[in-house]
């Protein structure tokens, strides 16, 4: 089963008429064999669709325009089977508005040493056909991925699949609608940003919506719908005594169920795949949406607290990118430190809104506890710890003259001690290369206090995502050096001046 059954990537093979019809037939046959093989055995997240071999400028331009207008096409996988003079590609690549990559491969693994002749050499020219194609892509300043190796190599298939995931995330972003309930938290800087530029650059359509309309959607939820939702909670989670039937906080859980149903209905009716809330703007809502937000994130919606629409949109993109990949993604905030020498840790959490897709526990704890912030009723929430292992924190910033994506690798651990008095979901981690350097690097780069925490995507995918949108990318990891990082930031300032 494909992770993106509604999408397809077009496999486009370049050649030219110079070699005659026999060679072009062989090119088409090899291309069909490769596409069939990759679809059957490559473990790809989306379907590859073979397009007719392109041999002249007019055909390439027509195909690129067709790709632009095809809603199911997320991008092009291009292969130069023979030499394909790259001036033929100028018009098409200039017009192309979707991601593309070069699969630098051959139909054959080994050279037939005993029988190789010039017919074979003319047919099997990826080695220099791909270089010609690569030059024109570089000359046009067109960002693109290059995957090198035989198409049956598992490494090549994995790289191709990873790139497809990024293309799917970009495709989703181009039509993403973000609903904002309330504005940004008052006086906060980093959650602000240029929504017009974001729509030009990424496609994000970010608009505010009335809390009154959301409250009306919640009020319209029926008792039968609420009871069905409670049955889901009882099947999926460990409920504390306070929220079980007859418990002292059961009423608050009923409110949380109504909020989830009403909120999801509002989002789905409007075609929104991401949203924000703000604890300062809750008029007409009985409690800060906590459980609802957690469950909606697990279903793939993007979310940002305190009006943080950039993090909400980025979370949605990373959810799409990692779909079916075995790792979760969540809204997160670096909250507090443990500075014990040699064991320095960050405790990440938020008031409520951490996605259970990252939970170590099979059945998180569902409880209702007081929340002093927001001045509303005690909210429901899921309580758990994040799975141990490597993770990445990412943040999307508006730097005034460009967007910057920062991704920081961290090692998540099982909390070294119980946290009996902390009634929220959390992640405990070692930043790389260590807390001091990793945190200093993050701060030097302007990294936000809100992040997307992910365990199902790679640094390379996030860098590719930034390249596809032609925005700045900053990587903080095991080999980060503060002096070098500051120099790279200055280079970025010069590049986007």
Curated annotation (Swiss-Prot):
Keywords for the protein's UniProt record, in alphabetical order: Arabinose catabolism, Carbohydrate metabolism, Isomerase, Manganese, Metal-binding
Enzyme Commission number(s) of this protein: 5.3.1.4
InterPro entries xrefs: Ara_Isoase_C, AraA_central, AraA_N, AraA_N_sf, Fuc/Ara_isomerase_C, Fucose_isomerase_N/cen_sf, Lara_isomerase
Free-text comment on the cofactor: Binds 1 Mn(2+) ion per subunit.
One of the protein's GO biological processes: L-arabinose catabolic process to xylulose 5-phosphate
Cofactor: Mn(2+)
Annotated GO MF terms: L-arabinose isomerase activity; manganese ion binding
One Pfam match: Arabinose_Iso_C
Keyword hit for S-adenosyl-L-methionine: no
GO cellular component labels: cytosol
Catalytic activity as recorded in UniProt: beta-L-arabinopyranose = L-ribulose
Similarity comment: Belongs to the arabinose isomerase family.
The protein's name: L-arabinose isomerase
Organism: Leptothrix cholodnii (strain ATCC 51168 / LMG 8142 / SP-6) (Leptothrix discophora (strain SP-6))
Originating gene: araA
């Amino acid at each position: 089963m494909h992770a993106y059954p509604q999408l397809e990537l077009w496999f486009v093979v370049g050649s030219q008429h110079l070699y005659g019809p026999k060679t072009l037939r062989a090119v088409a046959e090899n291309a069909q064999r490769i596409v069939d093989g990759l679809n059957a055995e490559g473990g790809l997240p989306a379907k590859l669709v073979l397009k007719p071999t392109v041999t002249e400028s007019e055909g390439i331009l027509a195909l690129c325009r067709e790709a632009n207008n095809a809603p199911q096409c997320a991008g092009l996988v291009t292969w130069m089977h023979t030499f394909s003079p790259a001036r033929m590609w100028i018009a098409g690549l200039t017009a192309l508005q979707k991601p593309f990559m070069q699969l630098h491969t051959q139909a054959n693994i080994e050279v037939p040493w005993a029988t190789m002749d010039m017919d074979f050499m003319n047919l099997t020219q990826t080695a220099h056909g791909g270089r010609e194609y690569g030059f024109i892509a570089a000359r046009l300043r067109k960002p693109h991925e290059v995957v090198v190796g035989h198409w049956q190599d598992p490494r090549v298939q994995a790289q191709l699949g990873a790139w497809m995931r990024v293309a799917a995330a970009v495709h989703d972003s181009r039509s993403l609608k973000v609903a904002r309930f309330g504005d940004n938290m008052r006086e906060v800087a980093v959650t602000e940003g240029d929504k017009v530029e974001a729509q030009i650059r990424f496609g994000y359509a970010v608009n505010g919506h009335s809390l009154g309309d959301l409250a009306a959607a919640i009020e319209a939820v029926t008792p039968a719908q609420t009871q069905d939702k409670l049955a889901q909670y009882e099947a999926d989670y460990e409920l504390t005594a306070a929220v079980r039937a007859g418990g002292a906080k059961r009423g608050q859980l009923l409110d949380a169920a109504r909020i989830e149903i009403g909120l999801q209905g509002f989002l789905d009716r409007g075609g929104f795949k991401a949203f924000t809330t703000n604890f300062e703007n809750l008029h007409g809502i009985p409690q800060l949406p906590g459980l609802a937000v957690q469950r909606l994130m697990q279903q793939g919606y993007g979310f940002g607290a305190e009006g943080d629409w950039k993090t909400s949109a980025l979370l949605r993109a990373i959810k799409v990118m990692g779909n079916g990949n075995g790792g979760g993604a969540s809204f997160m905030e670096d909250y507090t430190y443990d500075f014990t020498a040699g064991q320095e840790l960050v405790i990440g959490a938020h008031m409520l809104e951490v996605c259970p897709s990252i939970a170590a526990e099979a059945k998180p704890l569902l409880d209702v506890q007081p929340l002093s912030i927001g001045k509303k009723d005690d909210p429901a929430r899921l309580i758990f710890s994040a799975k141990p292992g490597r993770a990445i924190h990412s943040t999307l910033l508006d730097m005034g003259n460009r967007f910057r994506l920062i991704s920081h690798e961290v090692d998540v651990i099982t909390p070294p001690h119980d946290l009996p008095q902390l009634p929220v979901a959390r992640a405990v981690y070692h930043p790389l290369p260590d807390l001091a350097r990793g945190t200093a690097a993050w701060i030097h780069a302007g990294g936000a206090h809100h992040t997307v925490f992910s365990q199902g995507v790679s640094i390379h995918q996030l860098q590719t995502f930034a390249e596809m949108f032609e925005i700045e990318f900053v990587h903080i990891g095991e080999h980060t050096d503060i002096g070098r990082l500051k120099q790279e930031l200055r280079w970025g300032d010069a590049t986007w001046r």
